[in-house]
Structures are given as structure tokens and as C-alpha cells.
Amino acid sequence: MNPYEPVEGLYVNAKQYHRILKRREARAKLEERLRGVQTTKKPYLHESRHKHAMRRPRGPGGRFLTADKVSKLRAQEAAEAAANGGSTGDDVNATNANDATVPATVSSEVTHTSEGYADSNDSRPSSISNSSESPAPINSATASMSPANNTSGNNITSPNVRGELDMSGNIAMSGGPTNTASTSGPVPHDMTVLPQTDSNTSNLMSSGSQLGSFATASTNGNNSTTTTTSSAAHPGSFHKGTNDYSSTLAGNEHSAFPGLDVYHDDSVSAGAAFIPHNPMDSIDHLDVNDPTATGLPVLPASDIDPLNLTGNTQDSMIIGQQTYPSHGSSGTMK
């Protein structure tokens, strides 16, 4: 079959003809789209060629310049530089030389300025001089302290400063300024403050002359013991309280009544309101709302805390509800 001879047309029906036209239109659109993508796609460059392309001079629009145009531009720049009579911006040595002279000039100006402050009649003290004459290392403990803090003793911002209370009632600072700062209020004449001997033990002795009372408190961890003798409120009465949160104290006949018992001497007056009662029963099956129940003290919650109801050789006592005046000692003894 000769391809150059005219070929007799093939017969197709209407449906086949419509399908052939649709296929030709779709193929033409696809070829046109692929042709546009291939023209806009960036060509692949090897790494070395890419670096070379990045070093090549570009003109307006990012297009590479030809060698002829590049030589013309360089000749034009050289002529402009010769006409100006100066060096171009590419002269790195001249720039570095100019930069090297700047620190010396600045340091000399700073030196003269600081000396002028030291010699002039300024409001600042004359002992302040520049850092080149008397260099002093900056310590982290004193970095946050202003010059006013070195003389006042009240504004203390250093984390290493610790305060200690001496015998005269003043706070002596260790690790910071050696000045002493007195407490906010005067120390009463009837109160003696003992120095602290242990980090976990603190003793406080106070005597109240107004009520004739004597109080001693010592703290060891969670245990605190309070001994109080009041001649004004209860003449001849003697109370001792112990708070031990780590153990359960037992009353008479091994009954569980933790942290509560009463000591008293034989010279109890009628004002103390001690009422003999039956031995204490276990607190587990007692009616708390019934004040006449065996072993329950008739006391408000504020008066039960400083009492100790263990170890007495007599019957347990119920102390009537009674308001106890303060003993005049500073601090809470619990």
C-alpha cells in the first residue's frame, strides 16, 4: 500500500465521528499544556554549574549578562572611580584601617570623661574613678546591690545575706554589709532573747511581770513543750503542754487520748476550777456532744491544745470552761 496515494475515506457513523472529534480536541489540549510546562520548567543544573551561575553577574530581571556587556560595565565603573579620585567600596584594607582607629579614639574619650568626673565638682563622690585605674571584679553576690545598699543595711537584695539576732536585739548580717539593723519595735524590758544554738532547736524564755507568769518554749522538729505558771490567773496552778504529732499518748489504763492530759500540784485553789472525775475512758466510743461523759474535758478547742493529759497518778480531771488571759509573752507557744 502506497502511503502517498490518496486513501479512500473510511465510513463511520455519527456516534463514532463525534467520539473521534472529542479525542482529537483532548489530545490537542494536552499537547498544548505540556508544551507550556516544558518551556517554563527550569533546567537542571549540576552543583558546580549552579555555583558558577550564582557567581555570574546578572542584569535587570535576573538575566545573565554576556561577557561583552560585563566588560563594558566594569570599564564604566573604573572610569567613574577615576573621576571621583577615590577608592571604590571593594577596597577592604582601607575600610579595616579606618575601623581599627575607632576603638582607640573611643577609649581615650572615655578616659578623659571619667577623669573629668573625678576632678570636677560633681554630686557623686570623688572616690569614683574610671575602670582602667582601679579594676575590681564583679561578684555575683554584690552585683544586685546598689551603692545605697552598702550603707543603709535596710535594702538588702543579695541572696547570700543571712540575718542573725544578737543579744542586744539587733540583726547582724553575715555575707553582706557589716552594718546592723534594729528590729521593727523595741525589745520589752521583761523579755530575754537567747541566741540560737541549733538549726532545728530554738529556745524562747519570757517573763510577764504584769500577770506574774513564766513561760518556756523549746522546739525540736515537730515536738514543742510549753510550761506555764500563772499566779494572777490561777494561783498555784501548774500546767504543762506537749504537742507530739508523731506518737499517740495514752491516758490512764492505756486509754487512747492523744496529746491531752493535766498535771497539777496539791495547792490548787478554787479559782482553778479543777473537778475530780472518774478515770478516762477510751475516746473511741465517747459521745463528743455530751460534756458529762467519762473522760471528756469541758473545754473549748482553743484551750485543749496546750494541755497534756497523760501520766497523772490521780483520777482524770475535767477543767471547767474558763477564759485564760494572755501571759504577756511575745510569740505563739504551741
Swiss-Prot record:
Residues 46-65, 75-239 are annotated as: Disordered. The keyword Oxidoreductase does not apply. GO terms for biological process: positive regulation of transcription by RNA polymerase II; regulation of aerobic respiration; regulation of carbohydrate metabolic process. InterPro entries: CCAAT-binding_factor_CS, NFYA. One of its GO terms (cellular component) is nucleus. Pfam families: CBFB_NFYA (PF02045). It is found in: Nucleus. GO terms for molecular function: DNA-binding transcription activator activity, RNA polymerase II-specific; promoter-enhancer loop anchoring activity; RNA polymerase II cis-regulatory region sequence-specific DNA binding; RNA polymerase II core promoter sequence-specific DNA binding; sequence-specific DNA binding. Its main location: nucleus. PROSITE patterns: NFYA_HAP2_1, NFYA_HAP2_2. A motif (Subunit association domain (SAD)) lies at residues 11-35. Residues 48-58 have a biased composition (Basic residues). Residues 93-114, 142-160, 176-185, 194-213 have a biased composition (Polar residues). Residues 118-141, 215-233 have a biased composition (Low complexity). It comes from the Eukaryota. The keyword Nucleus applies. Residues 42-67 bind DNA. Keywords: Activator, DNA-binding, Nucleus, Transcription, Transcription regulation. Global regulator of respiratory functions in yeast cells. It belongs to a complex that binds to the sequence CCAAT located upstream of genes involved in mitochondrial electron transport. Belongs to the NFYA/HAP2 subunit family. Belongs to a heterotrimeric CCAAT-binding complex. This is Transcriptional activator hap2.
